[in-house]
Amino acid sequence: MRSGLGWRSLNPVEAVADVHSIENKDTLFRIAYEARNPEARRLALLKMGDKRLMAAFAQSDCSPIVRRLMVRELDDIALVRHIAENDDDRSVRESAAQRLAQLERESAGQI
C-alpha cells in the first residue's frame, strides 16, 4: 500500500517509483538532498548525471549505500583512491578499491 509520500517515503519501492517519473533537474536536485530513502537519493543523482554532485555524495552522504554506489560512477583516480583509503565503511572502501583498479586498467589501456 502506497503512503502517498512519493519520493519522501521511507518505502524504497514507493520512493524510487516516484523518482523514476521525475525529469525536472531542480526537483531531482532537491530529492538528492532531501529524500529520506537512500535509494531515492541515489537514483536522483544518477538521473542528473552531474559528476561533481556524485563526487560530493560519494564522500559525504550519511548512507554507505549512496556512497558505495556513487563511487562506482567516479572517474577521478585521486578521489577514488582517497575514498578507498579513508571511508569509514568497509563496503565503501571495497567498492572504491574495485573502481580504482578498473580506472587504473583503463588508463593503462588494458580495457
Positions of the model-derived regions?
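Alpha-helical scaffold segments
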Residues: 1-111
